[in-house]
Amino acid sequence: MPQKVRIALDAMGGDVGAAVVIPGAAIALSRHPDAEFLLFGDSAKIVPELDQHPRLKAVSRVIHTDVAVSMEDKPSQALRRGRKTSSMWLALEAVKKGEADVAVSAGNTGALVAMARFCLRMLEGIDRPALAAIWPTRRAKCVVLDLGATIGGDAHHLVALAAMGGALASVLFEKPRPTVGLLNIGVEEIKGHQEIREAGEMLRSMNLPQLDYIGFVEGDGIGKGEADVIVTEGFSGNIALKAAEGAVRQMMDLLRSAIKASWLAQIGYLLARGAFRVLREKIDPKNYNGSVVLGLNGIVVKSHGGSDAEGFARAVDVGYEMARFDLLTKINQTLNRDGGALAPAPVAQEAVS
Amino acid sequence: MPQKVRIALDAMGGDVGAAVVIPGAAIALSRHPDAEFLLFGDSAKIVPELDQHPRLKAVSRVIHTDVAVSMEDKPSQALRRGRKTSSMWLALEAVKKGEADVAVSAGNTGALVAMARFCLRMLEGIDRPALAAIWPTRRAKCVVLDLGATIGGDAHHLVALAAMGGALASVLFEKPRPTVGLLNIGVEEIKGHQEIREAGEMLRSMNLPQLDYIGFVEGDGIGKGEADVIVTEGFSGNIALKAAEGAVRQMMDLLRSAIKASWLAQIGYLLARGAFRVLREKIDPKNYNGSVVLGLNGIVVKSHGGSDAEGFARAVDVGYEMARFDLLTKINQTLNRDGGALAPAPVAQEAVS
């Protein structure tokens, strides 16, 4: 990787587009002065924004295209209309051509995953992409995947997710051997689905040097911080993330209306507002923006479509770190080197009788 | 149903047993003076508790047994050791024999579901039991099922869950035609699993008089109150519930430690503590205790194993209401009467050309 981190941005992605992406990039640049940007999209919209951020302008190149994938496009429509021409595709292609180290888009998730898969192709041994997000816990943070890039999957898929999530966590949290748990339920006698039990057995017998498999984790174990990486197929991962987000939002609403209902509570709130700010800071989805699309020959980060400039900057931060600390190499090592996750299981030595 | 509501209690169930169950029953009796109780378990433990609650004692009968299912017993162990003899089994059997209108147990979930299935048998047309819980939402409350009585399931299973959940919601919320949504994710082009889409089509074409099918609901739609009933198979239902519970607990922890860190915030908290009490009241799991085991020839309510007397009383309240308002008849109507959920789909009339 060259000295600079070269970041390709889909400047048209998200609910707002350039008016969020460009100021967001400017914020990220202030935190990472060694970043450079390729900005793909409608130059008539990008350039006026860029003119307001001269430092960003100095390290950016604008590549014009009229075509943008809309937030409503289905993946197949996006591919049909936007392949080779859209700002989303061109940002991904820059990574493919080696002109950028990472692509960041706030465009629609389904389209981005489909295009990334089509443009960058899957890593050797990986069948399907996955979306990984950073989740706040009581103890610190954890990585949860897959959040819905695809749904379902056998034990090998779960093991691949564990390996990729482990590599991501080792980069993000600077842990050489992050703990990994499989999301499961504790009610049934024989716990959970067959494929989860199988994946657990595989991970245990592999005993990978790059990750520490700790067993099953239930839904409430995510927030408790029971593991650095929580692995599950995309359906339940998506449900878990959204149910938790919904519960938090609902609680904030309830608290707000309870406080509004009493003037004493309002005074109390004013006095305690420092504490509330700490809380909001810790749980604000904006601070956890930036899901990583894993499993590809290239690094792609998905920003929330509705995020503001500060939120988008966080997604750029994630992309920067993934590129700077060479996520792809780490993933490949975990998957393939020294009896990695995709190597055949070691044969037990026969005991001498 | 006779004038009185007769409630069979597994007095040994839960982490504590009689010392929670008996005071809990006393609290529930104060709210429902027309209840009567059958108390199954070790009379040496039950009677001393009962002596402290003379009003409860006056409407209770103690049926002694030495055998209790432990919280650690696997379902198969519980059945082997506790069938026909344990306090859990005897409470269920009282319902089967028509001596009680409902059974309530805080015993272990897997054992209770297995025993209930074995003792009471499934309703006609229902293959598997389901666990339904009441969930607080921004707007009011909703019913979520299945929370893990079994995992997986085809479209017919989901339709049966919708019908049973609808009947439960109509009793709980006094709505003649509660809204029902299928839990799903919104990322993939063709949303979610095949069986969910199929179930959606079936529910739409059935257009049942007892429930209003509104389509798919995402994970964050549960807390928003998008439907009175949220239907999903047991794995994702369990994950959703626990992830949301975990997020709420985590948030309360964060808030608590943020407030503790500043004396100004502590004063603010004192002033606002009425508002916090309102919040706690609204989200306290204790106030939502009591999951209903659905699909059986009889009403069974599961209390959380770790709940206190007030929590257990809530579970008894749920059981009381289910019996008083004749949940079973409502379920059977929704399932079978007038082209109910289990009737064959109506054949479209041919248009006269």
UniProtKB/Swiss-Prot annotation, chains A, B:
Pfam families with a match to the protein in the record: FA_synthesis
- Compartments it resides in: Cytoplasm
- In which domain of life is the source organism classified? Bacteria
Instruction: Cite the Gene3D superfamilies for this sequence.
Output: Isopropylmalate Dehydrogenase (3.40.718.10)
Task: Indicate the secretion signal residues.
Answer: none
User: What Enzyme Commission number does this protein have?
Assistant: 2.3.1.274
Q: Which reaction does it catalyse?
A: a fatty acyl-[ACP] + phosphate = an acyl phosphate + holo-[ACP]
Q: Which residues form a coiled coil?
A: none
GO terms (molecular function) for this protein are: phosphate:acyl-[acyl carrier protein] acyltransferase activity
Question: Its GO biological process terms?
Answer: fatty acid biosynthetic process; phospholipid biosynthetic process
Q: In which pathway does it act?
A: Lipid metabolism; phospholipid metabolism
Protein purpose: Catalyzes the reversible formation of acyl-phosphate (acyl-PO(4)) from acyl-[acyl-carrier-protein] (acyl-ACP). This enzyme utilizes acyl-ACP as fatty acyl donor, but not acyl-CoA.
Under the subunit heading, UniProt states: Homodimer. Probably interacts with PlsY.
What family does the database annotate?
Belongs to the PlsX family.
Protein's name according to its UniProt entry: Phosphate acyltransferase
